[in-house]
Amino acid sequence: MISSETKHMQNYINGKWVDAKSGKQEVIPNPATGETIATVTISDVEDVDMAVAAAKEVFPEWSDIPVPNRTRYLLDYWKLLQDNKEELAKIITLENGKSLRDAQGEVQRGIEVVELATSTPSMMMGDALPSIAKGIDGSIWRYPLGVVAGITPFNFPMMVPLWMFPLAIACGNTFVLKTSERTPILAERLVELFYEAGFPKGVLNLVHGGKEVVNRFLTHPDIEAVSFVGSEPVAKHVYQTGTAHGKRVQALAGAKNHAVVMPDCDVEKTIQGVLGAAFGSSGERCMACSVVAVVDDIADEFLEKLVKETKKLRVGDGMDDSNFIGPVIRESHKERVLSYIDSGVDEGAHLLVDGRKIKEETPDGYYVGATIFDHVTQDMKIWQDEIFAPVLSVVRVSDLEEGIRVTNQSKFANGAVIYTNSGKSAQQFRNRIDAGMIGVNVNVPAPMAFFSFAGNKASFYGDLGTNGKDGVQFYTRKKVVTERWF
């Protein structure tokens, strides 16, 4: 249950809740009110070393358990997550700020990833070919890597960790997790439920902290692989540093997702889709729609209706079901977002909806309202940068060809969407867009867990994405066996 008392969040290492050796801690506010709800211990190198040692010690025992038996633990974990869905969603809203509706959606998507991980035995199966030569057979086997680490962001404190450790652990690895130090309460609950499911101690370890923890993950000789989700500059650092130290790395980075709106789209459904994609979760998601490229023929009609509907969106505490947009994560991030809105005005974009001017029921919360700019061009910062907020830029284009060109000019290529009723236009868009995840009349083209999740260009550093077969391949190594018997 959620308590009104201030909590103190600790590391979980080798079966025990412990404070970091440094004694450092940070304050965790409720973004909706600014009130302190928790403190969190902040780790350094020594704490990471302890967590890795615990994971390394239990690895031989854990990896020796047959894979069907390992996944049975996950079935129990899945059941516990299901039984605690409402509590988990409320924790997310409390410390992240997103609406309870969005938090409930995140919880469900996270549980679906655990469902996927329970099918690990079939996904780990290798290949075999008999009689590759006279009396000789060939086969491919998959084995776990050892100790692996995960670094996850504040914006999806449940779903993203569950992209990582359930699948990695089902494959036979042991895990050290660093969630965002901004959302430690949900991390604690995920670990508590994990061990309620009966997993041996040391299989999953949790360390809170900042760049010292990240850099130790990247250089620790006993960590075999690192999964990361976060901003583009850090993703690039994680990939370059980790691979330089011989580690397998997948680093999912930033985004500037475009939606191309064609004249033949269903206007009403498209507007509702854009509202959710741009302003849901306060725009703090790597699959948010942050740019709409609307074809001139429909632009005025589309924007008139979009602005009208946007102004109806309520801003406030995510615990209130009537509010569509909750706070952003911190006061510092709010100030950053406001500076981008100022920049858009200064650079000549037309401000149609101003999120700086909202009535705040809780003035100490970190609120930014839905914001829409029109006549945005590619030389403006609001088009170029990931703002991570409920700020939507509208670029007017002459046709599909220009819409594709504008979309592909972004350095990011995470997701992209087209709204159309033309199969020909959709096919052309799908084939020519650079993005790693594409939607056709799908507002947020985040795939189900049995598909891989990864972008292209500056949105992804690595080869294998998260989830699905990519996830299993990332968390295992192949051995090719050629054998003959006399």
Swiss-Prot record:
Q: Which GO terms describe its biological process?
A: inositol catabolic process; thymine catabolic process; valine catabolic process
Q: Which cysteines are joined by disulfide bonds?
A: none
Keyword Oxidoreductase assigned: yes
Binding of NAD(+): at which residues?
A: F154, K178, E181, R182, S231, E386
Read off the Gene3D superfamilies from this record: Aldehyde Dehydrogenase, Chain A, domain 1, Aldehyde Dehydrogenase, Chain A, domain 2
EC identifiers of the protein? 1.2.1.27
Q: Which residues form the active site?
A: C286
**GO function terms (MF aspect):** malonate-semialdehyde dehydrogenase (acetylating) activity; methylmalonate-semialdehyde dehydrogenase (acylating, NAD) activity
Pathway listed: Polyol metabolism; myo-inositol degradation into acetyl-CoA; acetyl-CoA from myo-inositol: step 7/7
Q: Which keywords fit this entry according to its UniProt record?
A: NAD, Oxidoreductase
Q: Which reaction does it catalyse?
A: 3-oxopropanoate + NAD(+) + CoA + H2O = hydrogencarbonate + acetyl-CoA + NADH + H(+); 2-methyl-3-oxopropanoate + NAD(+) + CoA + H2O = propanoyl-CoA + hydrogencarbonate + NADH + H(+)
Q: Which domain of life is it from?
A: Bacteria
Q: Which InterPro entries match?
A: Ald_DH/histidinol_DH (IPR016161), Ald_DH_C (IPR016163), Ald_DH_CS_CYS (IPR016160), Ald_DH_N (IPR016162), Aldehyde_DH_dom (IPR015590), MeMal-semiAld_DH (IPR010061), MSDH_GmP_bac (IPR023510)
Q: Which Pfam families match?
A: Aldedh
Q: What does this protein do?
A: Catalyzes the oxidation of malonate semialdehyde (MSA) and methylmalonate semialdehyde (MMSA) into acetyl-CoA and propanoyl-CoA, respectively. Is involved in a myo-inositol catabolic pathway. Bicarbonate, and not CO2, is the end-product of the enzymatic reaction.
Indicate the family of this protein: Belongs to the aldehyde dehydrogenase family. IolA subfamily.
What NCBIfam families does this protein map onto?
Answer: MMSDH
Instruction: List the HAMAP family.
Output: IolA
- PANTHER family hit by this protein: MALONATE-SEMIALDEHYDE DEHYDROGENASE
- What's the protein called, per UniProt? Malonate-semialdehyde dehydrogenase 1
